[in-house]
Amino acid sequence: MSGEAIRVIVTGGTFDKHYDEIRGELTFRESHVPEILKRARVKVPVAVEPNQLIDSLQMQDENRRAVLDSCSRAEEDRIVITHGTDTMTTTAALLGAAGLEKTIVLTGAMVPYQVQDSDALFNFGEKRGQEAGDHRRSQKALCKIRF
């Protein structure tokens, strides 16, 4: 697929955690990405692919291979991956070593999207812009974390 279309691969991380008021802890239910895309008024075609909803500290080699497989199979040349920040660089290294002819950026959050003053919306928007700007210049997996 060419043009402006992008694929968003959802893996979980703090980005997608929900605060469970009953248990008083952060859990996973479903991804916040569809709501974020709506709020960000993204006008290009976007395919959202739920890959897994886990904390990146629990991500193992087979989980990373599932992300790589999704990237390999994607028709889109431009991919944004939501990912936990703790092991984002490990996944980025695997994706970069694969040598895919695609622009792949990973983004995460230090504060869940659902929580006030979260960095998730900003980080997603920044990566979308980075993905668009870097599309023709780089075919490596990019990973930047904003603190």
Residue locations for each model-derived region?
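Active-site histidine-anchored catalytic micro-motif
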Residues: 2-147
